[in-house]
Swiss-Prot record:
Function, as annotated: NDH-1 shuttles electrons from NADH, via FMN and iron-sulfur (Fe-S) centers, to quinones in the respiratory chain. The immediate electron acceptor for the enzyme in this species is believed to be ubiquinone. Couples the redox reaction to proton translocation (for every two electrons transferred, four hydrogen ions are translocated across the cytoplasmic membrane), and thus conserves the redox energy in a proton gradient.
E.C. designation(s): 7.1.1.-
TM regions (residue ranges): 8-28, 35-55, 71-91, 105-125, 127-147, 159-179, 203-223, 235-255, 271-291, 297-317, 326-346, 373-393, 408-430, 455-475
Catalytic reaction annotation: a quinone + NADH + 5 H(+)(in) = a quinol + NAD(+) + 4 H(+)(out)
One Gene Ontology term from the biological process aspect of the record: ATP synthesis coupled electron transport
Lineage, uppermost ranks: Bacteria, Pseudomonadati, Pseudomonadota, Gammaproteobacteria, Enterobacterales
Organism of provenance: Salmonella paratyphi A (strain ATCC 9150 / SARB42)
Family membership: Belongs to the complex I subunit 2 family.
Protein name: NADH-quinone oxidoreductase subunit N
Keyword Glycoprotein assigned: no
């Protein structure tokens, strides 16, 4: 296949981030300079984000048999790049107090974001596997970056071992699918399934095993056991990336697979996914009730949020509204998570041992950091799905597609799960306004709102509120990505 200039334009985000990886690597080899390498990383990610405009002008196309660039890919590439940018921004002040090598952090984030972009453009099971591995391998190092802390190292080892096992299941499942269908391309798989192969035992077994890989990365029950420990043990900026970019990219590629290859047409697959969604929603919310560590709480709540998204995925065959629901929900989840983890990062900067992740550390925050407390309140309300926030719009969409597809038991699970979630999110919000403890703990810098991380947190809060009241710009953007499939 001949690569034309149009193909190169379509691959601009991937090429720019790849070039940035090389430049940062050479910069580290030449001279260690934290500010220089952080700046190069942010410039590269911003350039990749701007290049999406040129990609849009080029139109949808199959760049290679492995990759398709279209509106869908652009939307998810943009979300991954935004999450990566926020991670680098939150990491800079955190790393200022870090005594070991600082620069490699940005290199690992860039490589992981490269994997996320690859997943957003994936059109083949080989690309899916490569993308998942490319996003996972740097996370092994990022999670254990504060390696002098026992819980960070423990979290990294847990994630590494379990991730390797999940990847093995994914690869074995792909082998079974290939053995039955003779194809790994999403479109070719769609044709094979359309020819009546969907009920072949080998194919069903293959897809069943393949669920384990993405299910692990998305923290879905019963593949969720790593989530609370890793969220708690990982540095706050890494938890930001883990909760946003990683999950958005992987959910995006799973949805594209379901669009091309109508796996959801199989009643057996739908029942299995329905049980996973139901269990994730209920279990995630119930376990979050008793948490006193904010990062663990957000870890358990992420299990339930991915359960909500799975409802929209199951309803995908019922209409295009499911794609719209997933896009809007993921955007709301991205900005809400960036804000919540951003506050934790600001409270934990610079690196001074364990993060400020205990709920007690935030007690009475309003009385000395009122704006930061207001931002955290907005994020908790959005994650809870309270009206006038972007989280409510996303949750409303999920309920609407659930009703449209007559998934009544899952709709009931979403309603019950949201009611349970309201309690623990409000518990965090209320603690911000209680009387401050006699001995103050960790605190954000006095001028936090003027730092790059503070600006990202404030913009996230503003977007959550503005798009919660006036969601039409976001809905229009997501709708633009839908017809190009």
């Amino acid at each position: 296949m001949t690569i034309t200039p149009q193909h190169l334009i379509a691959l601009l985000p991937l090429l720019i981030v790849g070039l940035t990886v090389v430049v940062v690597m050479l910069s580290i080899a030449w001279r260690r300079n934290h500010f220089l390498n952080a700046t190069l990383s942010v410039i590269g990610l911003n350039a990749a984000l701007v290049s999406l405009w040129f990609v849009g002008q080029a139109g949808a196309m199959d760049v290679t048999p492995l990759m398709r660039v279209d509106g869908f890919a652009m939307l998810y590439t943009g979300l991954v790049l935004l999450a990566s940018l926020a991670t680098c921004t939150f990491a800079y002040p955190w790393l200022e107090g870090y005594n070991d090598n600082q620069e490699e952090f940005y290199l690992l984030v860039l490589i992981a974001s490269l994997g996320g972009i690859l997943l957003a453009n994936a059109n083949h099971l080989a690309t899916l596997f490569l993308g998942i591995e490319l996003i996972s391998l740097p996370l092994f190092g990022l999670i254990g970056y504060a390696f002098r802390q026992k819980r960070s190292l423990e979290a990294s080892i847990k994630y590494t071992i379990l991730s390797a096992a999940a990847s093995s299941f994914l690869l074995f499942g792909m082998a079974l699918v290939y053995a039955q269908s003779g194809n790994l391309s999403f479109e070719a798989l769609g044709k094979s399934l359309g020819d009546g192969m969907l009920h072949e035992p080998l194919l069903l077994a293959g897809f069943g095993l393949m669920i384990v890989g993405p299910g692990f990365k998305l923290s879905l029950v019963p593949f969720h056991l790593w989530t609370p420990d890793v969220y708690q043990g990982a540095p706050a900026p890494v938890s930001t990336f883990l909760a946003t970019a990683s999950k958005i990219a992987i959910f995006g590629v799973v949805m594209r697979l379901f669009l091309y290859a109508p796996v959801g047409d199989s009643e057996a697959v739908r029942v299995v996914l329905g049980i996973i969604a139901f269990a994730s929603i209920i279990f995630g919310n119930l376990m979050a009730l008793s948490q006193t560590n904010i990062k663990r709480l957000l870890g358990y709540s992420s299990i339930s949020h991915l359960g909500y998204l799975l409802v929209a995925l199951i309803a995908l065959q019922s209409g295009e509204m499911s794609m719209e629901a997933v896009g809007v929900y993921l955007a709301g989840y991205l900005f809400s998570s960036l804000g919540a983890f951003g506050v934790v990062s600001l409270m934990s900067s610079p690196f001074r041992g364990p993060d400020a992740d205990s709920l007690y550390s935030y007690r009475g925050l309003f009385w000395h950091r009122p704006v930061l407390a207001a931002v955290m309140t907005v994020m908790m309300l959005s994650l809870a799905g309270i009206p006038m926030t972007l989280g409510f719009i996303g949750k409303f969409y999920v309920l609407a597609v659930g009703v449209q597809a007559s998934l009544w038991w899952l709709v009931a699970a979403v309603v019950v799960g949201s009611a349970i979630g309201l309690y623990y999110y409000l518990r965090v919000a209320v603690s911000l306004y209680l009387h401050a403890p006699q001995q103050p703990g960790r605190d954000a810098p006095t001028n936090w709102q003027y730092s790059a991380g503070g600006i990202v947190v404030l913009i996230s809060a503003l977007l959550v509120l503005v798009l919660g009241v006036w969601p039409q710009p976001l809905i229009s953007l997501v709708q633009l990505a839908t017809p190009l499939m």
